[in-house]
């Protein structure tokens, strides 16, 4: 099971039918195919079960898991530059003149095409969890751009995807700052030992601390001086640890050993059964975590 490491949370802002069988057909039209000799990158859907499955959707209890794979050809800039300079020098010597910029740009395209078949590939995978019960979509990545790119592929596959980032009623950084200032958190949450504080003014500086008692005079002085907590390490129910950011993203998810080992009684050879059990467990825990976190931060903004 690919336990999520990050959560970028989006709200489906109107009801759309997300039927697994129909989705399967829609995603299949955009399934992953490797780069051809002249492709710089390719993205498409793969089975969440990897080599152990063929279906592009994994569905349980109204929860849908899908995975996008991206292949990128790696062409380091110095390699392109060296090949381009050699080609320019050769042509300028042959023609006894300096090449124009437009000619050099055209040559660069030629160089890229000649190098692509020999380029190494880098593969990455981004999983998307669709919670049809709560009308939420979660993307397992740390970058908003990567999340948006993955959702763009999903939108293209489905034809429509009315989602917006989950927004809260109150600024998150104000709530995080108050938690650190007072040392008092809502039930179920506990401060850990890592935070980032930023000055309200752009040139006012950033403080990052690790392995630090956050309820102390030093941190209090920074808050008193006008800095706000923009990232905060938290423990939830002694089951999940995370970094909560002021943009609403949740990063560096760490599930407790008790959680991860809960389904160890399932035969290891039953890959699908274990995957399914872990998916049910993970989505149940994360749905509760998201709900508790939104409530602790003052609730979702009215739409």
From Swiss-Prot:
Residues making up the signal peptide according to the UniProt record: none
Predominant location category: cytoplasm
GO annotation, cellular component aspect: bacterial nucleoid; cytoplasm
Record GO biological process: DNA recombination; regulation of DNA recombination
Keyword set, alphabetical order: Cytoplasm, DNA recombination
Subcellular location: Cytoplasm, Nucleoid
Gene Ontology terms, MF aspect: double-stranded DNA binding
Family annotation (InterPro entries): RdgC (IPR007476)
Family named by the database record: Belongs to the RdgC family.
Physiological role: May be involved in recombination.
PANTHER family: RECOMBINATION-ASSOCIATED PROTEIN RDGC (PTHR38103:SF1)
Protein's recorded name: Recombination-associated protein RdgC
Lineage: Bacteria, Pseudomonadati, Pseudomonadota, Gammaproteobacteria, Enterobacterales
């Amino acid at each position: 099971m690919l336990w999520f490491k990050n959560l970028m949370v989006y709200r489906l802002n109107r009801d759309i039918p997300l039927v697994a069988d129909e989705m399967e057909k829609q995603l299949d039209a955009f399934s992953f195919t490797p780069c051809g000799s002249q492709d710089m990158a390719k993205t498409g859907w793969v089975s969440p079960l990897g080599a152990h499955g063929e279906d592009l959707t994994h569905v349980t209890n109204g929860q849908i898991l899908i995975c996008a794979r991206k292949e990128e050809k790696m062409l380091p800039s110095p390699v392109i530059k060296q090949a381009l300079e050699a080609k320019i020098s050769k042509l300028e010597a042959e023609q006894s003149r300096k090449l124009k910029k437009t000619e050099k740009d055209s040559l660069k395209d030629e160089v890229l095409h000649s190098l692509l078949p020999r380029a190494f590939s880098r593969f990455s995978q981004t999983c998307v969890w669709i919670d049809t019960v709560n009308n939420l979509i979660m993307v397992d990545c740390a970058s908003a751009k990567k999340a948006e790119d993955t959702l763009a592929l999903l939108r293209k596959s489905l034809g429509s995807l009315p989602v917006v980032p989950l927004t809260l009623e109150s600024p998150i950084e104000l709530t995080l700052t108050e938690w650190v200032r007072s040392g008092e958190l809502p039930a179920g949450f506990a401060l850990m030992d890592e935070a980032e504080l930023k000055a309200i003014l752009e040139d006012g500086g950033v403080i990052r601390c690790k392995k630090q008692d956050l309820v102390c005079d030093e941190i209090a002085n920074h808050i008193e001086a006008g800095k706000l907590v923009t990232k905060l390490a938290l423990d939830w129910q002694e089951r999940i640890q995370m970094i909560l950011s002021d943009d609403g993203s949740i990063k560096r998810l760490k599930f407790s050993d008790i959680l991860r080992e809960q389904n160890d009684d399932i035969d290891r050879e039953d890959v699908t059964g274990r995957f399914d059990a872990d998916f049910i467990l993970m989505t149940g825990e994360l749905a509760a975590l998201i709900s508790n976190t939104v409530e602790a931060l003052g609730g979702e903004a009215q739409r």
